Amino acid sequence: IELNAARFLTLDAAVKMDTVGNKIAASEIAQIKVYAPNVALKIIDRAIQIHGGEGVSQYTPLASMYAHMRTLRLADGPDEVHRRAVARYELGKYMS
């Protein structure tokens, strides 16, 4: 469910970027930057849990995937920056 939600949020933002431009789609882009990496981390974490101790060993790529995805959450700014941007975009719609 969460994976499909991330996929559809991404597709919605892509359509908006193509039709009205990146500036107007900025809120959707910021939402993706928060939501998609968090969903990926949850999925990887579940896979690690299913594999037990082997999930964090060198015998599976899961520990490395988790580390890479966790780093990605910081690459374009921490989640808090993007959450603040979403709040500003959304509140800006009602402030005149």
Region locations from a protein language model:
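Alpha-helical interface subdomain recognition
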Residues: 1-96
